[in-house]
């Protein structure tokens, strides 16, 4: 009886150490770098409309395009995009460009079942510096991607790109007339360099 318990204990010990080894290997394989696509040429090439539109509480809208990269480990972001701010009647207020400065946060929901393994869903907050015709300003760009049906992201999660101007308007409502998709494409160090 004691030998049997000793054998079972040894098996459990080995199984536990294997599980720890497997988890450590999975952690080393975790993707931490992504290309970010918001209404850009890549998205257009796979059949989604260019430009992502968000609305502020006063009815103003902002159209956004962005192509960039994020590195989760270093909280780094790079890339550039364009914006066009319209009032609630559709009249131009401002337009210009913006540059990613820093990744504030990123949650990776992983690839969707049935989709390409490099196409990840997630939520990023990226600090940007914008230069428009009316002046320059800082903003936070929120990029949400819920590509694919399963497993589902949290219920409050909405596909879209949102733009909060520091000391200004918060474009936090999806205003797209057609279904827009954003995308995080996983890349490896080898692909990046």
Residue ranges and their predicted role:
Residues 158-173:
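Low-complexity, intrinsically disordered Gly/Pro/Thr-rich segments
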Residues 80-84, 124-126, 161:
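Short polybasic amphipathic segments
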Residues 8-17:
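Bacterial N-terminal signal peptides
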Residues 1-9:
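Bacterial N-terminal signal peptides that target proteins for export
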Residues 23-106, 169-193:
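N-terminal segment immediately downstream of the Sec signal-peptide cleavage site
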Residues 112-158:
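Acidic, glycine-rich flexible loop segments
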């Amino acid at each position: 009886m004691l030998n049997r318990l000793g054998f079972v204990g040894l098996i459990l010990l080995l199984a536990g150490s294997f599980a720890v080894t497997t988890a450590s290997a999975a952690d080393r394989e975790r993707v931490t770098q992504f290309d970010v696509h918001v209404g850009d040429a890549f998205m257009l090439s796979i059949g989604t409309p260019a430009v992502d539109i968000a609305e502020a509480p006063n009815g103003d809208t902002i159209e956004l395009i962005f192509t960039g990269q994020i590195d989760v480990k270093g909280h780094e972001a790079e890339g550039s995009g364009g914006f066009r701010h319209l009032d609630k009647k559709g009249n131009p207020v401002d337009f210009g460009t913006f540059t990613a400065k820093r990744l504030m946060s990123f949650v990776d929901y992983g690839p969707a079942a049935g989709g390409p393994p490099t196409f990840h869903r997630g939520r990023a907050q990226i600090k940007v510096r914008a230069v428009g015709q009316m002046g320059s300003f800082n903003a936070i760009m929120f990029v949400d991607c819920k590509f694919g049906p399963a497993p589902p992201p949290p219920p409050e999660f909405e596909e879209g790109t949102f733009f909060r101007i520091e000391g200004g308007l918060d474009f936090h409502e999806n205003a797209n007339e057609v279904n827009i998709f954003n995308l995080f494409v996983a890349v490896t160090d080898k692909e990046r360099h």
